[in-house]
């Protein structure tokens, strides 16, 4: 094999201490692309040094996100970063793992199989909430037109307590929906079910029940809300429905309060979202949404995509993304099972700090 002066130079570069290298001595532009490449180890160190002053996620007691996964899970996820979650024809087994996760959650939330439930992964609960809201809006619009309601007379509205997460405000702004907020106060640290119907009219696309309010940690009384909605539906042509924002609670309540009725056991709960990167115990970001039946997910919101190699239905706001979080979620379901999640959740019920 022939060698040249360039080989000598390349070899010498590895002998130079990292912080004595030429690349470490030059000023790297912050907001435009630099002219020449640098060695991988130096790029790694420079980026790592940039992050030194940030907080340590493991020490952040205020985070809502999972900050630790087992080495086996981390390894599995790092080995699958390149898989595109939407390319189901190229990665059929990855698609099957997503399908398994959807069915596991549907079973956990008592989805009635006779109504042909469906669901999908998302990049987090915010996207899942957007999808749940869109489904309610499109369904309301179709039903309103069938009733002869003038849908141009006023904007549709969504009813929710003032303990809402900002994604619902985004939903209402992005998709031209009025947000009708039921105030919380000292006597009502969750949705005031005695007043909720005061905010409802025939332009209401649905009511959001929150399972785990950010400010208080409380669950809205979904069973009481369901009874109120059922009574309303008996006396009105306009059908009210409930979406459960279970970003925190939907992966917590089944293990800690299994007798609490908040999910698809209640007839008027039509969709539920949760965050896999909270009590699903997966690194950010992954979320999930399940609809109880076909009629609650309007067909016009489902797109058949064929240009990735095979026709496939997709319901999402985002498109290409790594499948590693989905794979991490299935790993956790497989690894922990019901009893494992129950033990983990029971360890978080009442934390004490002294």
Predicted segments, located by residue:
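Glycine- and acidic
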Residues: 28-29, 81-89, 113-120, 152-155, ...
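N-terminal entrance/gating region of PLP-dependent enzymes' catalytic architecture
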Residues: 1-116
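Short glycine/serine- and small hydrophobic-enriched flexible loop segments
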Residues: 107, 134-138, 331-335
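Active-site C-terminal subdomain of aminotransferase-like
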Residues: 255-258, 264-354
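Conserved PLP-enzyme active-site core in the AAT-like
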Residues: 7-12, 124-298
């Amino acid at each position: 094999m022939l060698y040249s002066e360039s080989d000598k130079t390349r070899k010498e570069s590895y002998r130079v201490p990292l912080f004595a290298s030429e690349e470490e001595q030059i000023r790297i532009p912050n907001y435009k692309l630099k002219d020449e490449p640098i060695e991988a180890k130096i790029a790694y160190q420079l980026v790592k040094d940039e992050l030194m002053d940030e907080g340590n996620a493991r020490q952040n007691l205020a985070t809502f996100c999972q900050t630790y996964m087992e080495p086996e899970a981390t390894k599995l996820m790092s080995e699958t970063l390149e898989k595109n979650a939407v390319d189901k024809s190229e990665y059929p087994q990855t698609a099957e793992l997503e399908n398994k996760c959807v069915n596991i959650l549907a079973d956990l939330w008592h989805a009635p199989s006779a109504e042909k439930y469906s669901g999908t992964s998302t990049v987090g609960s915010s996207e899942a909430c957007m999808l749940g809201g869109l489904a309610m809006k499109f369904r309301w619009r179709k039903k309103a037109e069938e009733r002869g309601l003038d849908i141009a007379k006023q904007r549709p509205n969504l009813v929710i307590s003032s303990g809402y997460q900002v994604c619902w405000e985004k939903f209402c702004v992005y998709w031209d929906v009025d947000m009708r907020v039921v105030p919380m106060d000292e006597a009502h640290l969750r949705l005031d079910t005695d007043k909720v119907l005061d905010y409802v009219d025939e332009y209401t696309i649905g009511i959001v029940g929150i399972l785990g309010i950010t400010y208080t940690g409380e669950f809205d009384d979904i069973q009481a809300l369901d009874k109120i909605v059922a009574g309303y539906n008996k006396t009105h042509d306009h059908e009210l429905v409930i979406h459960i924002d279970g970003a925190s609670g939907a992966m917590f309540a089944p293990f800690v309060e299994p007798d609490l009725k908040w999910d698809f056991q209640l007839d008027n709960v039509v969709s539920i979202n949760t965050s896999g990167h909270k009590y699903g115990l997966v690194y950010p970001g992954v979320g999930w949404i399940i609809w109880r039946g076909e009629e609650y997910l309007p067909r016009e919101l489902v797109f058949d995509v064929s240009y990735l190699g095979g026709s496939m239905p997709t319901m999402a706001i985002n498109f290409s993304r790594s499948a590693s979080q989905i794979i991490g979620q299935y790993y956790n379901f497989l690894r922990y099972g019901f009893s494992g999640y129950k033990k983990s959740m029971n360890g978080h019920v009442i934390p004490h700090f002294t």
